[in-house]
Amino acid sequence: MPNKPYDPQSKKYKYTKYTDGHYLVVKKNDHAKFDKDFPYIDKSKKFKRRFKAFRILVVGLAMPVMAVRVLLKVEGRKNIKKHKEILKQGVVSISNHVHIWDYIAVMDAIRPFIPYHPSWATNCRGENKTLIRYTGGVPVPEGDIRASYQFTKAIEEHIASGGWFHTYAEGSMWESYQPIRPFKKGAFRWAVKTGKPILPLAFSYRKPKGLVRLIWGKNAPLLTLRIGEPIFPDMTIPTPQAIEKLTIQAHEAVCRLAGIEPSENIYPPIYDNTLRIDYYHNPNAEPLDQQTEDATEEK
């Protein structure tokens, strides 16, 4: 396991009451419909042309900028090469979500593989919708059972046919947050249903230094991304147990890759309406007590 990582303990971000909450403010809304007829994995020629064009832009521009901005270090690329033949048959990768650009770091780390990823529907209607969509973002439908069925079907078919799907199993982005939050089971359900492995990745922090510190300040931590070994689902036990087992194994793996002993991580491995734990004081975080009281009054 890596050495104990740097903990930024940021007081800047409005971390939410529940560990899967979004605090990012999206300014635009084009009211796009993500229903049962939406092409979640778009196979049209028009989409593929634009997808390739954006890939060139990301590799040529965004990846170098990201690498310089956070002085990105990637460790464990040997595991991509070592398990290349297995990964070519389909894989679900997971990681913590700690930076607005960290998906670019993932894309860089797993080259030559090209991933898709589930994306918050609000983001897919917002000002960054084009960038998100053409870098593999798949909008997660909300409040529509038939749409959710088609979303899941498209993803499982993509994985089963040899595709790569990257998931932020914590459910949302919390910038500069060190603990590994509880995982939702969706990614692990896809892995079990398709019989494909989970590939754990983890971001951890380093103290800012050099030009990054001068330009962005002492509260802009540097990033390290570590790539682990594939974890295969246990196909000998019933599906619900296999999903739970895989979720726990993956959470422990991400903790270790981030330099955290699983038994010392402050959160459980599986999300269950889990509340944020304030192990340090962040005045900008959503107040826990007040929100709890409000929820009680509403009931």
Residue spans for each PLM region:
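Polybasic, low-complexity association/targeting segments
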Residues: 36-53
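A generic secondary-structure micro-motif detector
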Residues: 51-52, 118, 144-145, 176-178
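Non-catalytic C-terminal accessory region of glycerolipid acyltransferases
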Residues: 2-34, 46, 149-299
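Short gly/ser/thr-rich secondary-structure transition/capping motifs
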Residues: 70-77, 147-149, 207-208
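Short hydrophobic helices that act as membrane-entry/anchoring signals
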Residues: 51-70, 133
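Catalytic core of membrane glycerolipid acyltransferases/transacylases, capturing the structured
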Residues: 85-145
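A short, well-structured juxtamembrane/interface segment
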Residues: 64-89
